[in-house]
UniProtKB/Swiss-Prot annotation:
GO terms for cellular component: cytoplasm. GO terms for molecular function: ATP binding; tryptophan-tRNA ligase activity. Gene3D superfamilies: HUPs, Tyrosyl-Transfer RNA Synthetase. This is Tryptophan--tRNA ligase. It comes from Thermococcus kodakarensis (strain ATCC BAA-918 / JCM 12380 / KOD1) (Pyrococcus kodakaraensis (strain KOD1)). The gene is trpS.
């Protein structure tokens, strides 16, 4: 029996990503696909690909073939606004930005304020709408192209419900229950919701690519069962690993456990104190033993954060690994360096977040892609 669990709502234990590929029936992101990405974009690959933070896919090979043939593709991702965003939430958006820039494609970002109202008992609809605005500022701060990006909030972009109806007609309860584990206690809004989440995959008559954490994959499995019957492509996806919280390599960073997370709106000084107090290290019990035996970067959250986001230079990362194993580097040194980088990131992000307040209207309503979507009629196959 596996000692980890991954669902769209819960991640527990130390995840074995190779086993997860088998469980979910996805494919590994191979060296060949990574090299093909570099060849087609003529760009240096970001660390998310080089270090296999994105490790699994569905039909990414077909996405690259579509791009090479001139058919193109589009990107779709999203955010469920149930509270403030933390570093674990934002990292996949940086990978999405790289894909948008280097393939020069449209991006649709769904803000699911309706979903979080349905799935979170303690949240009112006003709460999720308020968090939607706050989360949108963080997303805009990443630096997407405002004319090629449409950020839409489900409670406002009600056309999504019209598009969801024919999709809902294709999904019976047993299909939804098999994927999501719904039961007699599940609210009827929750049972309908997968149709709304699938609707943006039909925004264009091209293949859709979804960059997302692997726990979100079940939503797209259903879409792949019926997309072709509506005259569209099965959606493709590339899956990321999880960013661990400060206190453990198990599970993922969680907003429900504040000591595990660094929030994007945290005061940089307070974030530093949090890292110093809570970040798990792979060091020995004493400095003497650390010097003699070396540390264990494989068991260290601090090293993992450097690997995932905060050390872009591969050679410097490997030197950090070597110095840790050799006992030349102490946990205190590593923590201090990580704190400096996290604080620098937060200061830059928060400055861009403030600037994003003036850009919300363009991303949601007046940018080229936004206007096109507000003006566009419901696609013919989704009117039946």
């Amino acid at each position: 029996m596996d000692d980890f669990k991954v669902t769209p709502w819960d991640v527990e234990g130390v995840v074995d990503y190779n086993k997860l590929i088998e469980q979910f029936g996805t494919s590994p992101l191979t060296d060949e696909l990574i090299e093909k990405t570099a060849e087609l974009t003529k760009s240096e690959l970001p660390l998310f690909f080089r270090r296999r933070f994105f490790f699994s896919h569905r039909d990414y090979d077909k996405v690259l073939a579509d791009y090479e043939s001139g058919r193109g593709f589009f990107l779709y991702t999203g955010r469920g606004p149930s509270g403030p965003m933390h570093i674990g939430h934002i990292i996949p958006f940086f990978a999405t930005k790289w894909l948008q820039e280097n393939f020069d494609v449209n991006l649709y970002i769904q803000i699911t304020d309706d979903e979080k109202f349905l799935f979170k008992e303690k949240l009112s609809f006003e709460d999720t709408k308020r968090w939607a605005y706050e989360n949108i500022l963080d997303i805009i701060a990443v630096g997407f192209d405002p004319d090629k990006t449409f950020i839409f909030q489900n409670s406002e972009f009600t056309k999504i419900y019209e598009m969801a109806l024919p999709i809902a007609k294709k999904i019976n309860f047993s299909m939804a229950r098999a994927v999501f584990g719904f039961n007699e206690q599940s609210k009827i809004g929750m049972i309908f919701y997968p149709a709304i989440q699938a609707a943006p995959t039909f925004f264009e008559k091209k293949r859709c690519l979804i960059p997302a954490a692997i726990d979100q994959d079940p939503y797209w499995r259903l879409q792949r069962d019926f997309a072709e019957s509506l005259g569209y492509y099965k959606t493709a996806a590339i899956h990321s690993k999880f960013v661990p919280g400060l206190t453990s390599l198990e599970g993922k960073m969680s907003a429900s456990k504040p000591e595990t997370a660094v929030y994007l709106t945290d005061d940089p000084e307070e974030a530093g104190k949090k890292i110093w107090k809570f970040a798990l290290t792979g060091g020995q019990p004493t400095l003497k033993e650390q010097r003699e035996k070396g540390g264990n970067p494989e068991k260290c959250v601090v090293f993992k954060w450097f690997e995932i986001f905060f050390e872009p230079d591969d050679e410097k990362l490997m030197e950090r690994y070597r110095a840790c194993k050799a006992g030349e580097l102490t946990c205190g040194q590593c923590k201090r360096e990580l704190i400096e980088r996290v604080q620098k990131f937060l200061k830059e992000h928060q400055k861009k977040r403030k600037e994003a307040e003036k850009k919300v209207e363009k991303f949601k309503y007046t940018g080229e892609l936004a206007q096109e979507q507000w003006d566009k009629a419901i696609p013919e196959p989704l009117r039946t």
